[in-house]
Design a protein with these regions (language model features):
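Short, structured segments at the rim of ligand-binding sites
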Residues: 1-424
Length: 424
């Protein structure tokens, strides 16, 4: 196992190119199950979650190749591998998004056997809304020894609400959308997730011949079609990776230019950084983050898009820990998502958690120590804290980080961080 070692206190400067969005790439790769003919998908990051998804799709009969320009060629040959319908536990347990093969398998092969998903341990994330939506389209669903077993004759369009206890469901919307594109008749999804990654899947499917309207809103209308064809498509840039690098610039009082960003997907993050006192200049597909001033504490509430994403909460917590004064974070998506606060406290942060709130009494003095990563974004928060902590920070269990960030230590090092990856 590897760990990351950071010597804090170095200002970051320079340019960084943002990769394609992991959370758009995973459902789009799964949706290739629906297509007749080859697809070429550009901008897919080289991270562990993508490697896991490639294994799952190969298991289902996919022919997947890395193309020289960094894109991925994916083809499922019609008529072959109809019997391959299983996404096994040993792969699915590694990441939650692997459940998004359920809709395409059911739609294209009439059967699916998918293990209950894994991923990061951040509280209740059930898939009941996925199953409710698929049942409404006519699927028969049972569970057996940790597997969802789904079967269907012809799926039929209907009206479905995906509203749940915790609001909308991103992967549930993806699963129902991919199941509905080849269904008979029209499907209306109410309370659909509006996240850019859901929009990206819809645009991808439309390019392949689907008829989806209302993209970006909470009501999606899907007219079923007979067939979808292969396409060339470029994934949107990763708004969470972009936000993470923005905070890296802010927390070290540096100046970073981000290239390949969609600033329209980053409005809430940019607005909050400006409120804190960070200078952010968003222009076309670049953004420049710099700071000369004193920062102000802030209150943050995580909510579904277009509000501040829960996946940026740990990174903002790290920043707020370094700003004198009282800040409050309200975590409205995953109320238990504060595991990283205990590790930040080890570094000297003053954080009190009273779910779903965390109250931070910030001060500019964090100290390096040994900390452990509990989940992907918590890992990013600890790296950011390590960049400014006095002394040396050792970050253990970084396999969580590798699930979502490609070579984060090399990219931060290029910006001037004193950061290395070493074997434990």
């Amino acid at each position: 196992l590897d760990k990351i070692v950071i010597e804090g206190g170095h200002r970051l400067e320079g340019k960084v190119r943002i990769n394609g969005a992991k959370n758009a790439a995973l459902p789009i790769m799964a949706a290739c199950l629906l297509l007749h003919g080859p697809s070429r998908i550009k901008g897919i990051p080289n991270i562990v979650d993508i490697q896991t998804q490639i294994k799952i799709l190969k298991n289902l009969g996919g022919d997947i190749r890395h193309i020289e320009d960094g894109s991925l060629g994916i083809i499922f040959r019609d008529g072959e591998h109809k019997e391959k319908i299983t996404a096994p536990y040993d792969l699915v347990r590694k990441m939650r998004a692997s459940v998004c093969v359920l809709g395409p398998l059911l739609s294209k092969r009439g059967n699916a056997k998918v293990s209950y998903p894994g991923g990061c341990v951040i509280g209740q994330r059930p898939i009941d809304l996925h199953l409710k939506g698929l049942k409404a389209l006519g699927a028969r669903i049972e569970t057996d020894e940790g597997y969802v077993i789904a079967s269907a004759g012809t799926l039929k369009g209907t009206r479905i609400s995906l509203k749940g206890q915790y609001g909308t469901t991103v992967l549930g919307t993806c699963n129902v959308m991919t199941a509905a594109v080849l269904a008979e008749g029209t499907t209306i999804i109410e309370d659909a997730a509006c996240e850019p990654e859901v929009q990206d899947l819809a645009y991808f499917l439309n390019k392949a011949g689907a008829k989806i309207s209302g993209i970006g809103g909470s009501i999606l209308t899907i007219e079923g079609v007979k067939e979808l064809h292969g396409v060339d498509y470029e994934i949107i840039p990763d708004r969470i990776e972009a936000g993470t690098f923005m905070i890296a610039g802010a927390i070290t009082k540096g100046e970073i230019t981000l290239e390949n960003v969609r600033n329209d997907h980053l409005v809430a993050t940019i607005e909050k950084l400006r409120e804190i006192g960070v200078e952010v200049t968003a222009n076309g597909n670049t953004a420049v983050v710099k700071s000369n001033n004193t920062y102000r504490p802030a209150n943050i509430t995580t909510m579904p898009y277009p509000c501040l994403p829960t996946d940026m909460q740990a990174q903002f917590m790290a920043l707020l820990c370094t700003i004198s004064g009282k800040s409050v974070i309200a975590e409205k998506i995953f109320p238990d998502r504060f595991i990283h606060s205990a590790e930040l406290r080890r570094m000297g942060a003053d954080i009190r958690v009273d779910v779903p709130y965390a109250t931070i009494n910030g001060s500019p003095f964090l100290s390096g120590t040994h900390v452990m990563v509990s989940d992907l974004r918590a890992g990013a928060g600890l790296v950011l804290a390590g960049l400014v902590a006095k002394g040396t920070t050792h970050i253990h269990r970084i396999y969580h980080l590798d699930r979502g960030y490609e070579q984060i230590e090399k990219r931060l090092s290029k910006l001037g961080a004193h950061i290395t990856r070493v074997s434990e």
